[in-house]
Design a protein with these regions (language model features):
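Exposed, low-structure sequence patches enriched in small/polar residues
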Residues: 1-369
């Protein structure tokens, strides 16, 4: 670290090496890479705020066993973070960045892999790069006198990849094949959360709502288009602490998701689901905790047809001392054998049942050291 004009300049260097060996029934694929990262950052501080500029540079050398040539990339990812305390109660944080990331996590493979009994994927055999531009703004408010706080967040992301996966769904198998053409995904997101503590009533109330918009390219069975889908979520939690031996907590949440008409579907495909849970903790005597919780979720499977899933659990715990404790739990008292969910995954609607083990009873003795 250095001091320039009264502000810190920090230099960092990271070196990383990774060797991959991927086995398949037909062949073995080996690949390796060296990653050199230089991370300079400069921060300017003043009363109530600061700004930080980061200028990381990555140099990647990638080799694979089936090709003599080596791949190498130089990637530059600048970012700027700004923080300002606007007033005693209000704080603002904003950032902009342009990130370039090489695909160092997934190993290369120059063939077709079998993922499960019917899904196959043609491997990515070259170094790919994802370029991400982003900007976000956050406002935070905190009043310690009225015990009220809120946070507002707005974010935008534009991600460009040098390849995309083309999918082929057939009666006997599913195949994913990479296509080396640039494709872009755009995301807008907004969120609001707030919390209020009513001291005299012993009630802690919190809530949040968020909205997101996504635009993503999909290629499926030789049909291609951009999907535009939306999601809206809201939740409220209330907790009462008026008694030391009884503490209830209620949570309610709801979701609405919809997808704009495209070549895959001519309707908005609106789906709704809701959830609520009630948790009750009892402390009748010192060191003993009894609890019970009930939850119920409602999923819209198709238009105006819903699946209702209800669960009830109960249990107790007794602390003998700071090291020893015993507990007993009963889960899934309604003895449900499965529950149903539905969702959209890109262009496809999924509706399935998740198997459960039914009612369970467990006793445990714990020792902490």
């Amino acid at each position: 670290a250095f001091n320039i004009a009264g502000n810190p300049l920090t230099l960092g260097y990271i070196i990383e090496y990774k060797h991959n060996r991927l086995y398949d029934t037909q062949q073995t694929a080996t690949s390796s890479y060296w990653l050199h990262t230089l991370e300079p950052s400069y921060q300017i501080q003043w009363s109530g705020g600061n700004v930080e500029l980061l200028l990381p540079v990555e140099y990647t050398i990638y080799r694979c066993g089936w090709r003599k040539e080596k791949d190498q990339k130089v990637l530059f990812s600048p970012s700027l973070d700004f923080t300002q305390q606007i007033s005693y109660l209000l704080r603002m944080e904003t950032s902009v960045a342009y990130n370039q990331n090489a695909s160092n996590d997934d190993p290369w493979f120059n063939g077709t892999m079998m993922n499960n009994y019917r899904t196959f994927t043609t491997g990515i055999d070259s170094l790919s790069v994802q370029r991400v531009a982003l900007a976000n703004l956050r406002l935070s408010y905190l009043n310690t006198i009225t015990l009220f706080s809120w946070n507002v967040y707005v974010g935008w992301t534009r991600s460009t990849s040098d390849h995309y996966l083309k999918s082929l769904y057939m009666p006997d198998y599913t195949l994913f094949v990479p296509v080396w053409n640039d494709r872009t995904k755009t995301t807008w997101s907004m969120a609001l959360s707030c919390r209020k503590n009513f001291r005299n009533a012993h009630i802690n109330l919190s809530g949040q709502t968020n909205y997101s918009y996504n635009k993503e390219f999909v290629s499926q069975n030789e049909v291609e288009d951009y999907l535009r889908y939306h999601a809206l979520h809201a939740s409220v939690t209330a907790q009462w602490s008026g008694l030391t031996w009884f503490q209830p907590k209620l949570t309610m949440a709801g979701n609405i998701s919809w997808k704009k008409p495209d070549v895959f579907s001519v309707t908005d495909n609106l789906l709704k689901n809701a959830y609520y849970s009630l948790t009750m903790d009892f402390y009748p005597i010192s060191k003993l905790r009894l609890y019970a919780d009930f939850s119920q979720s409602v999923f819209e499977i198709v238009r105006n047809h819903y699946s209702i899933n209800s669960f009830l659990n109960a249990g107790m715990r007794y602390d003998f001392n700071s090291r020893w404790s015993a507990s007993a739990n009963i889960n899934n008292l309604f003895n449900r054998k499965d529950y149903e969910v539905s969702l959209y995954q890109r262009a496809n609607f999924q509706y399935y049942r998740v198997p459960l083990r039914g009612r369970e009873f467990m006793i445990s003795l714990r020792f902490k050291y």
